[in-house]
Every structure is written in C-alpha cells, then in structure tokens.
Amino acid sequence: MAETQNDPLLPGYSFNAHLVAGLTPIEANGYLDFFIDRPLGMKGYILNLTIRGEGVINNQGKQFVCRPGDILLFPPGEIHHYGRHPDASEWYHQWVYFRPRAYWQEWLTWPAIFAQTGFFRPDEAHQPHFNELFGQIINAGQGEGRYSELLAINLLEQLLLRRMEAINESLHPPMDNRVRDACQYISDHLADSNFDIASVAQHVCLSPSRLSHLFRQQLGISVLSWREDQRISQAKLLLSTTRMPIATVGRNVGFDDQLYFSRVFKKCTGASPSEFRAGCE
C-alpha cells in the first residue's frame, strides 16, 4: 500500500483542504526541478506568484514565461503543466490552493493568457503590497492555531479585493443574479436533508437543467459539489469553534446519519470529525 504524501511540493499530495499555501524554491537540477503535470487540473483554484527566476507554463502547444511579479490563476479543471524555464537557473514561486467562497466569483474572472489560465501583474507601486499579502497568506495557512485557516482565507479575500481595486472593473461583468441567489438559498438551507436541485431552481425561476448549466458556467463546479463544499466548510467551522456533539454538527449541515457524515467529512478533509476537532484544540 502506497504511503500518504504529506508534502504539498511533491506529486501525490491530496489537497483535501479549503486552503493550502506554500513556497516552491526550484533550483536547476534540485529535487524540485521537475514539471508539474495535471492534465485534468484540480478541484479548486491555484494562485501562483513568481518571486525569483523564470517559469514556463505550457497549455496545448502554447507557452507563457512567467517572471517576478507575475500572478497566475488556474481555475478548477484547467491544465497544470509548468516548471522552471530551461534558460533560467531557478524559479521561486509562492502559491495558494483554495476553494472560493460563493461571493468571490466575479473577483476570480481574470484576463487569460490562454485557455482559462488567468493573468495579473500589479504595477510597481502596488507590487510590494501584493508580495506582502501573499507572504501573510502562506504564514497564516501554515499556522497551527484554531483560526489559522480562517485568517488565511480572509487575507486571500483581501488580495482578491486589492486586485479589483487595481483594475478596470467594467471589464468584468458581475455574477448572474440568479446564480448568486441560488448560492444564498443553498447556504440558507444547508441543514435540509431532503435537498434537491429542483427546489433551488424553482426559487430562482429557472429549470433545473438551466440552473445546472449556469452554475457550472459561472462557478466551474456542479450545484451538488458546491453545496458539499459549503457543508464541509460549515462543519469545520462548527467543529473548531463549538463543543457541539458531532451528530448535531452533522444535522446542522444536512446529515441525519452520523456515520455517513463522518465518512463524507473524512473523504473531503482526510480526517474524521473527531480527529479534525482534536487537531484544532
């Protein structure tokens, strides 16, 4: 049986978390000097900031060279094929893997270098602040305190908002109000164990098929997958900040069966609810 990979810099790491962040210091011929190759992308988003050297991003025959100050955004399902540029002696890049909050979506619509890979380069006046924010996200994300992940998520939100301040917002149409309302309805009914897409669609005056299409088009994920992410996120919050019994936590996010809740939670996070709670203490 293969051992679990606990280093997010190496292939095989599961990324079963709402936020993981770090620095990848690639030196020529070093142990990290290989190309990341994920043809199907990932379930969440990845932000990538080059701080030293040069990297190269490949996507179906096209290439992009990233240099210090460049920020790339890989959305769910986007091809990941990148590494140190062969003409550079190093490529140091910071990165943040995350599952976004629903209301972030219009902040995640970036101009693309190709396919769906987004690109942003702050001007010289703003660059130091973005570098500082990235470092703060990594420090918080790697912390072991009860609120470390929430702090990292809030810092990431600040980074996304700082970017929105720095660009012409008219280039980015807002999220469809029906999708936004659907997200709010789902969030308000996480405890409903009889949830179905038809009830959400009826609430926003769409057919289930049309809602499913719009949801995936704008959020890059299915209705049910998004709801499961929100349920697990809320369960983690309740487990880490209250002494509520695990069965009650499960019922609060729509799981009447505690054993089934525990199985789903462990599948999504890599830890059982009791293990997760113990790690927060």
UniProtKB/Swiss-Prot annotation:
Residues 180-279 form the HTH araC/xylS-type domain. It comes from the Bacteria. GO terms for cellular component: cytoplasm. Keywords: Activator, Arabinose catabolism, Carbohydrate metabolism, Cytoplasm, DNA-binding, Repressor, Transcription, Transcription regulation. PROSITE patterns: HTH_ARAC_FAMILY_1, HTH_ARAC_FAMILY_2. One of its GO terms (biological process) is arabinose catabolic process. SMART domains: HTH_ARAC. NCBIfam families: PRK10572.1. This is Arabinose operon regulatory protein. It comes from Citrobacter freundii. The gene is araC.
